[in-house]
């Protein structure tokens, strides 16, 4: 089984969702199915079919989260240090064309949210920055062409 890097925060978020699904969502949908069964003919019972569909989604999500947790290699970013960019680093960069500065934390695939400043370890920008240090320029190949970014700062927060 291949281990997947994940921040401690990402692991906690998944664990909380798993607990919510198992303790709140699953019992609620079971109760909804039971109640819908009491309404008679199941073949034309929209409430029953909706609840069964919801149950399928919940069970699928539980299995997906359990798999991610089982494969997780949890990395406590607060215990990392160094000058090189690696998983968990928060990196400040400047676009060499537009002079626009951005700040991103490199996280696991399921944790990525660009609006929140978290980019996936497998993203083109992350792959270009891994192993680099402050002052180095990285090139990222995008559908719109090549973009160059200078690394301004590497932090461990």
Curated annotation (Swiss-Prot):
One of its GO terms (biological process) is DNA-templated transcription elongation. Coiled coil: none annotated. It comes from the Bacteria. Signal peptide: none annotated. Belongs to the GreA/GreB family. Keywords: DNA-binding, Transcription, Transcription regulation. PROSITE patterns: GREAB_1. This is Transcription elongation factor GreA. GO terms for molecular function: DNA binding; RNA polymerase binding. Pfam families: GreA_GreB (PF01272), GreA_GreB_N (PF03449). InterPro entries: GreA/GreB_C_sf, TF_GreA/GreB_CS, Tscrpt_elong_fac_GreA, Tscrpt_elong_fac_GreA/B, Tscrpt_elong_fac_GreA/B_C, Tscrpt_elong_fac_GreA/B_fam, Tscrpt_elong_fac_GreA/B_N, Tscrpt_elong_fac_GreA/B_N_sf. Necessary for efficient RNA polymerase transcription elongation past template-encoded arresting sites. The arresting sites in DNA have the property of trapping a certain fraction of elongating RNA polymerases that pass through, resulting in locked ternary complexes. Cleavage of the nascent transcript by cleavage factors such as GreA or GreB allows the resumption of elongation from the new 3'terminus. GreA releases sequences of 2 to 3 nucleotides.
